[in-house]
């Protein structure tokens, strides 16, 4: 009987440790459909749901989530940018302190594309990883990135 009780206690402790692990890792890595931090993401398309447009020209628009400092950075196509992020329950994304260098693009269309990107990123409300894609959405639109 003592041996059985000991086995039950071990199972209970293992179950409790598993639950604690899930609770403490919550919506960080992997809970939003997959890993998104410490990966360089490249923007493929942006816009409103059902009306996405591809990135214009040879613009290299990127996004990095730095997990240790909870910072974002990347290229908007013309300018480098930076900010802070937090993940709240259910993969809610909050981006704060978004700033960028102030170089002008020679191409007005690329400058407008960058401004649209920054507006959508600034108003981001959620993120989801779907396979090799990262989807960020909010009140201003949707951003679709690939690894």
Regions found by a protein language model. Give the residues of each.
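Bacterial N-terminal signal peptides
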Residues: 14-23
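Lipid interaction determinants
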Residues: 22-147
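Hydrophobic alpha-helical segments
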Residues: 11-15, 71
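Intrinsically disordered, low-complexity regions enriched in serine, threonine, proline
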Residues: 1-2, 26
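Positively charged n-region of N-terminal signal peptides that target proteins for export
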Residues: 2-12
